[in-house]
Amino acid sequence: MTTQPSKQLETFENPVQTRDYRIHMEIPEFTCLCPKTGQPDFARLTLDYIPDKKCIELKSLKLYIWSYRDEGAFHEAVTNRILDDLVAAMKPRFIRLTSKFYVRGGIFTNVVAEHRKKGWQPQPPVLLEVFEQQFNTHG
């Protein structure tokens, strides 16, 4: 059982390929290094995707995210690299990665990167009552 950082992303077959549904993940402890100063940068990543044939396996995602801990990377570059690797592994219908980096020099940086599978169109939204977002583990 691997407990070391790894760039290997694993997938499993989407159990419901006939329906568009959103998978939402929050990764509150992303860390990489500032390529200019070598100081750690911390971010909260939010991953939303609509799978096609494959879903990402959570432990491999955790080890993949962990692999950036000692790498120097600009916020924009690392967000897009992670998105590209997820797209290559899963080939989702749609995916959005939002990186919210904690304050550095008085500046917060948010980077949002998206990919949409060629030809895929979302279903029209069904407008119901608006509910506040509810999270499993926090407010």
Curated annotation (Swiss-Prot):
Keyword annotations from UniProtKB, A to Z: Cytoplasm, NADP, Oxidoreductase, Queuosine biosynthesis
Transmembrane stretches, start-end: none
Catalytic activity as recorded in UniProt: 7-aminomethyl-7-carbaguanine + 2 NADP(+) = 7-cyano-7-deazaguanine + 2 NADPH + 3 H(+)
Active site: 34 (thioimide intermediate), 41 (proton donor)
GO molecular function, one term: preQ1 synthase activity
GO cellular component terms attached to this protein's record: cytoplasm
Domain of life: Bacteria
Chain residues that bind substrate: 56-58, 75-76
EC class (word): oxidoreductase
UniProt KW Metal-binding keyword: no
Subcellular location: Cytoplasm
One GO biological process term: queuosine biosynthetic process
Pathway(s) per entry: tRNA modification; tRNA-queuosine biosynthesis
EC number: 1.7.1.13
One Pfam family linked to the record: QueF
Family matches, as InterPro entries: GTP-CH-I_C/QueF, NADPH_dep_7-cyano-7-deazaG_red, QueF, QueF_type1
Stored NCBIfam families: QueF-II (TIGR03139)
Function: Catalyzes the NADPH-dependent reduction of 7-cyano-7-deazaguanine (preQ0) to 7-aminomethyl-7-deazaguanine (preQ1).
Family: Belongs to the GTP cyclohydrolase I family. QueF type 1 subfamily.
This protein's name: NADPH-dependent 7-cyano-7-deazaguanine reductase
Species the sequence originates in: Nitrosomonas europaea (strain ATCC 19718 / CIP 103999 / KCTC 2705 / NBRC 14298)
